[in-house]
Amino acid sequence: MAAIINQRVDQGESSMGGAKPTLLHKIAGHVARINDVILLSKDEGVWTASDDRSVRLYLKRDNDQFWPSIHHFMPVAPTCLFYSEETYKLLVGLINGNVYEFNVADDFNSMTESRKWTCHAGPISGLGFALSSELIFSCSRDKSIVWHCSENSNKVGSYLLENSCTAMVIDLPFVFVGDHGGHVTVLRIIDNQPNLVSKLSAHTNSITSLTWDGNKKVLYSGSSDHLIIMWDIGGGKGEAYELNGHNGKVTTLCAAPAAKRLFSADEHGKLMCWDMDVRRVETPEWKTSDCCQKCNQPFFWNLQAMWQRKVVGLRQHHCRTCGSAVCGSCCDNWTTYPPMGYETKVRICNDCAGRMKENPGNFDLTPLAIPHEIRTGITAMHLQETLGLLVTSGQNRVVMIWDVRSVCSAPSGSGGH
């Protein structure tokens, strides 16, 4: 029987206390999957892009309900949106690789097409606008990143990846692009020309979402491998910290830099709020061995040792806290370990379990994240941190607006990584 370390932490409050997101509004009416949502900060409104080819702007009316103020149909399904509240310009990326720009009326009752670009040969997977340099960025499943001048519409640069682009964030001069192979490419744009800085590789499946904390210079990547990785770009040490709290594909991420929080959501409807103002520990690399590193029993592929000892080979496991390659008998303990990002129970070896039991004061198991079940898979999410509002779209085609002020303002744990 597997041993459970410190069962009491299941009922304990997190480092942020007992705060939870509060549902404020539901917006129904879509007949197809919602691919993107944007929450306005200056007005009470939500942009949506749907597989039914529609781009809609919902505004809050006097009766406290949201109704579509703009309902525009695109030639094909829109895949992503970017909206500038300063310029009232809306960018719409389509499944056929085109990007449209619209001027939105200041009364939010209409939008007028101003131009379009045939940028890519595949679906648009990311859009961005750098106001300071007047550049519009787009990336696509066709493996390319392209940037145009917003003043004259001319293409000024491009870059080709080895895999399909799946997500992008911009903080010039840097551009971060996630791809289908699980890599994050870091580019520096100098005089409109791309320079490869590095390729971040740790995920085992495609990147689904990226978000950037400009205050701490930290990049977060979410993936189909259920994992979130925090890349400390500004630290200069190449440190990366794993966040394990999802049991399905992570679909979208939103950083709250001022509150030092990270919001993540997955395909099963689990919404997580992570405390990023705590000291975290890097996960160890998994060690390789042909025999259990605790009892020396051979693993099932070690045929020579199995034949010599006349024993049946064992399945290999790894201790999540020390990385040792061990057999099932030597790794029969389960525990959370939030400082290493493990918010759900993971397997650890008997030695690590013994140390935790003997010295519980050295292993703080207080949860460092708040889970919240939405009960429908999340397809898109957007945060307005200054308002303390979060918007999500679900697989049930319902848009939800959440009050997350209590989560963002809750006291955190000890600072630092």
UniProtKB/Swiss-Prot annotation:
Zinc fingers (FYVE-type) by residue: 286-357
Each WD repeat, start to end: 29-68, 119-157, 202-241, 245-284, 373-412
UniProt keyword terms in alphabetical order: Endocytosis, Metal-binding, Repeat, WD repeat, Zinc, Zinc-finger
An example Gene Ontology molecular-function term: zinc ion binding
GO biological process: one example: endocytosis
Binding positions (Zn(2+) 2): 319, 322, 349, 352
Taxonomic superkingdom: Eukaryota
Keyword Metal-binding carried by entry: yes
Gene3D superfamilies, per database record: YVTN repeat-like/Quinoprotein amine dehydrogenase, Zinc/RING finger domain, C3HC4 (zinc finger)
GO cellular component terms, A-Z: early endosome
Annotated binding of Zn(2+) 1, by residue: 292, 295, 327, 330
Purpose: Plays a role in coelomocyte endocytosis.
Name listed for the protein in its UniProt record: WD repeat and FYVE domain-containing protein 2
Gene: wdfy-2
